[in-house]
């Protein structure tokens, strides 16, 4: 049979040739089932006529349909979907694990509370290595284009940076005073408030229909500047509770934050194939690291948490709720659009709590100081996910348009 085959509709429609089907972009879902008794074939004209009263819907023109004439194959046979490669499956599993971030962190903390011995193998050196790998993975998501993008939205970026290092540190300080927290818990809560934005905020921003590009830029900006801001603000606000080694905090932040982020950005710029190969496994590694570190911090102080844990949970919830609330309100007051205001709210409300765990473990003598940091990781993950679910139901106007 010749390759040019035409379909004639006997209700007066113009015959459609095989190449015109491509132009019309027909799709199998729009074609009705063709009965063999309704087909007629003329050898002289090499034409197949369809005795049907149906017309081709207008919607067919919007979808592509590749018509391949083969004997014994009906018009309703659809091409089989291409199987996913191993790399695609790894990426799919990684995304699923990352999306369930609050669940894994909650399980890690619950395991540390109920069975503290589970995390006896974790050492302070391991916590540094784990956080370094996490920050390296974050750096691999950055490029020079991201840095150029910061120049196109200076207002949003500056507002986010200002709110990040004003709303959260001050909220932590006032919540500590309001609840009259013990010195070690107050210092830990202030440390959390002075930490940069958390990497999980990028995922939550995406779910909330926020400005993901701005989220990445804000996380990067607050993380890099944390080398100065975190030790400075912590020493200023927490000195009345405990002795703070500002220089030690600065060196640790430089080691586990700035250098890995810059190294990751360098790899992404000049070794793209390597980054493309390892990037699918970095998010689940980061999630696992955070869950283990939080479980370790909880396990180290399980008995104390069982006695006064409610107070720490309440303090952490109030801290992050104030971050989400004031981050959004002040952004809107400054005239920032809804999508970017959602992003700033999430960035301000979600902290890099695991950095607080590492810094508290390394530089504060009382291990209870790390407890608010670990509890904070669970609280902001759950609160942020709930907020994202609410916002996802109402898309910002610029996204709807």
Curated annotation (Swiss-Prot):
Keywords: Chloroplast, Membrane, Plastid, Transit peptide, Transmembrane, Transmembrane helix, Transport. It comes from the Eukaryota. It is a multi-pass membrane protein. GO terms for biological process: pantothenate import across plasma membrane. It is found in: Membrane; Plastid, Chloroplast envelope. The chain crosses the membrane at residues 92-112, 122-142, 156-176, 187-207, 212-232, 247-267, 278-298, 311-331, 371-391. GO terms for cellular component: chloroplast; chloroplast envelope; membrane. Residues 1-70 form a transit peptide. May function as sodium-coupled metabolite transporter across the chloroplast envelope. Belongs to the bile acid:sodium symporter (BASS) (TC 2.A.28) family. This is Probable sodium/metabolite cotransporter BASS1, chloroplastic.
